[in-house]
Amino acid sequence: MEIQRIENMCGGNGHVFLKPILNEKQLNGKCGLYAEVTLEPGCSLGFHMHYGESETYYILTGEGEYNDNGTSWRHVKAGDITFTPDGRGHGLANTGNTDMVFMALIIKD
């Protein structure tokens, strides 16, 4: 599938590269998204909320800062997993010197 370049995603800085793994038909109404996401150094995915769904990130490469529900930040790196349940929010910033690549999975409740 085609890689999408999205500017200021969810109010974040710079741009995000989004490579969908499954198309809408394959997601079958059960998932909102399954994609490989790339944040270049200095870019971020802005804080956003999830309602009626949850989202998991699995960090493949790079490092950055993860905004957990707008109340705390934590450092994340390759191999880390984040989970944002229904009714909560999150954001992610690449604070490293290399691309941060992660898998994003949105599961509908």
Predicted features along the sequence, with ranges:
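A short, N-terminal "cap"/entry segment at the start of jelly-roll beta-barrel domains
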Residues: 1-32, 46
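Glycine- and acidic-residue-biased ligand/ion/polar-headgroup-sensing regions
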Residues: 52-54, 58-64
